[in-house]
Amino acid sequence: MTQATIALFTGDPAGIGAELVQKLLDQPALRPKASILLIGQQGAIRTTADVRWHPWSGIDAPAFEPGIATARNGRYMLDALAEGVKLVADGSADAFCFAPLNKSALRLGGMHQEDELRWFAEFLNYHGVCGELNVLQNLWTARVTSHVPLKEVSQNLSSSKVCDAIKMISNALKAPQVLGRTVCP
């Protein structure tokens, strides 16, 4: 069986992404499960021979100031996300995964969408329902709202958004048992 290739972006270069990716790569038992193709700053992570770097325009980017959201790291993240999508689209990778992003920096860098999922939808010219699925063992949930303060949840609810979340999870699962539940930010 051919090993899957996962393009893995190290996330916000001013954040904890590289540290989290390093912790993942430091678990040797996980590496035989997939071939990892890293997207990020080459100097940010120690790698072994079985982990490859994708040679993209940001591989040798100058250091970013830790913990500071700027247009520069926002643009860097958007460019890296686009690079990851292109790797899957052209068959160079089977999947794309990314470490945490900084939404403030993404907006400063030019993202005008609500979040990275809507950015992906626009980038891919996708016009269907778009949202998050959360999985915990056999429990799958779809969010009606996401990343909004609790005090703003009720004003962000609508029957069409609830229906969209139900349609999304129903389409994602083969034989879903859909249960409506209480408000959760």
Label every model-predicted segment.
Residues 114-151:
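Flexible loop/hinge segments that line or gate small-molecule binding clefts
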Residues 1-118, 156-185:
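Contiguous, glycine/small-aliphatic-enriched amphipathic segments in soluble metabolic enzymes
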